[in-house]
């Protein structure tokens, strides 16, 4: 039997090209996944470092300084430590609920990043119901916390899970009319359209000036959603040890830790998008685009500037929840619920009524 060498070479080249196509296809699938995940991870590490440095300054002490330059790698060292710690399971608890709870909390918050625009058209999912999708997704996280508390078979954990669910429901309801007011002003529920609607009048076109009452209610509700002081009732150390986290250790405890800061970053980014103009700088780029012929709303330069502006606004806003943590005392549970149902909800509904009336009169 005579083997044609040209046919063998053709078969080999074809198989090589097919394997290269498969490799490029796999890389093309992984890059869009790992790029936002890496960016979010770095963002969380920066938040942890900022909180430790600001907290150290408020308490007049030295913050982390040994792990990396200025202690910026301290959070990474803590995460590595938790990764190698023993993962203990409660002997009489529901292991499935106990294990699934932290994952649900983290995944639901990660999905919220899909509708956040970091620059001009730089968003994973530009949906017409973007802001309301975020509200719907954020409602899933308390279910994971309640599952964690129930699966632990511990009275402190279960009480913390119930508190987390009650707190989330109480403050998500006043938060929704604030978002609806912004949608009415922008004539859209898309996060891209909301940012572009604020770019018409520069700095004075921000929704912060058109919705000051809604802005305050949104901030308070966001802090309660993130379970930050003075709203950290589900994790009150003096009453519940650590709340729904009491029985957790190792990487599962680390997931709750990450979810807390992920939620804080999501809230800050949505404050930036809804009230602070998003990626718009609101002042001219000082002749740089005109000098080099760069488009302000597109291209590499415009996209990079938009990302930097969005992150700068979000991280500047983070000073409010960080300083609030070391300023205000923890509220009681009855005070927490009264604030949400008796004060914030009527105020947000009144603000929505005023916004609707003004929009109808302007037609």
From Swiss-Prot:
PROSITE patterns: COMPLEX1_ND1_1 (PS00667), COMPLEX1_ND1_2 (PS00668)
Any one cellular-component term (Gene Ontology): chloroplast thylakoid membrane
Keywords: Chloroplast, Membrane, NAD, NADP, Plastid, Plastoquinone, Quinone, Thylakoid, Translocase, Transmembrane, Transmembrane helix
Molecular function terms from GO: NADH dehydrogenase activity; oxidoreductase activity, acting on NAD(P)H, quinone or similar compound as acceptor; quinone binding
Protein's cellular compartments: Plastid, Chloroplast thylakoid membrane
Catalyzed chemical reaction(s): a plastoquinone + NADH + (n+1) H(+)(in) = a plastoquinol + NAD(+) + n H(+)(out); a plastoquinone + NADPH + (n+1) H(+)(in) = a plastoquinol + NADP(+) + n H(+)(out)
Cited InterPro entries: NADH_UbQ_OxRdtase_su1/FPO, NADH_UbQ_OxRdtase_su1_CS
Record's keyword annotation contains Translocase: yes
GO terms, biological process: aerobic respiration; photosynthesis, light reaction
Principal EC category: translocase
Pfam families noted in UniProt: NADHdh
Membrane topology: Multi-pass membrane protein
EC number: 7.1.1.-
Bilayer-crossing regions: 30-50, 98-118, 127-147, 248-268, 300-320, 336-356
Family stated for the protein in its record: Belongs to the complex I subunit 1 family.
Subunit: NDH is composed of at least 16 different subunits, 5 of which are encoded in the nucleus.
Job description of the protein: NDH shuttles electrons from NAD(P)H:plastoquinone, via FMN and iron-sulfur (Fe-S) centers, to quinones in the photosynthetic chain and possibly in a chloroplast respiratory chain. The immediate electron acceptor for the enzyme in this species is believed to be plastoquinone. Couples the redox reaction to proton translocation, and thus conserves the redox energy in a proton gradient.
Official protein name in the record: NAD(P)H-quinone oxidoreductase subunit 1, chloroplastic
């Amino acid at each position: 039997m005579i083997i044609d060498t040209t046919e063998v070479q053709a078969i080999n080249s074809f198989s090589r090209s097919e394997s290269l196509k498969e490799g490029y296809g796999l890389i093309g699938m992984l890059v869009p996944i790992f790029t936002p995940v890496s960016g979010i991870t770095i963002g969380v590490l920066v938040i942890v470092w900022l909180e430790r440095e600001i907290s150290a300054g408020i308490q007049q002490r030295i913050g982390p300084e040994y792990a990396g330059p200025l202690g910026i790698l301290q959070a990474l060292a803590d995460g590595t430590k938790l990764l190698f710690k023993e993962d203990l399971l409660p002997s009489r608890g529901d292991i499935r609920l106990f294990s699934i709870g932290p994952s649900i909390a983290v995944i639901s918050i990660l999905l919220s990043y899909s509708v956040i625009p970091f620059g001009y058209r730089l968003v994973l999912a530009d949906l017409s119901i973007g802001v309301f999708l975020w509200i719907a997704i954020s409602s899933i996280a308390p279910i994971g916390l309640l599952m964690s508390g129930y699966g632990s078979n511990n009275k402190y954990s279960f009480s913390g899970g119930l508190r987390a669910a009650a707190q989330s429901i109480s403050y998500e309801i006043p938060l929704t009319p604030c978002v609806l007011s912004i949608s009415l002003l922008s004539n859209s529920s898309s996060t891209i359209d909301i940012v572009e609607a604020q770019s018409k009048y520069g700095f004075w076109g921000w929704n912060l000036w058109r919705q000051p009452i809604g802005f305050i209610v949104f901030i308070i509700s966001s802090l309660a959603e993130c379970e930050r002081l003075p709203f950290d009732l589900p994790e009150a150390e003096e009453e519940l040890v650590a709340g729904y986290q009491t029985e957790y250790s190792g990487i599962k405890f680390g997931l709750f830790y990450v979810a807390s800061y992920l939620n804080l970053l999501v809230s800050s980014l949505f404050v930036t998008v809804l009230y602070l103009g998003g990626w718009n700088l609101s002042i001219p780029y000082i002749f740089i685009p005109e000098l080099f012929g760069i488009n302000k709303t597109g291209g590499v330069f415009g996209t990079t500037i938009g990302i930097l502006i969005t992150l700068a606004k979000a991280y500047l806003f983070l000073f409010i929840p960080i300083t609030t943590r070391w300023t205000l005392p923890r509220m009681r549970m009855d005070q927490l619920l009264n604030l949400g149902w008796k004060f914030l909800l009527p105020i947000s509904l009144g603000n929505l009524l005023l916004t609707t009336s003004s929009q109808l009169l302007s037609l």
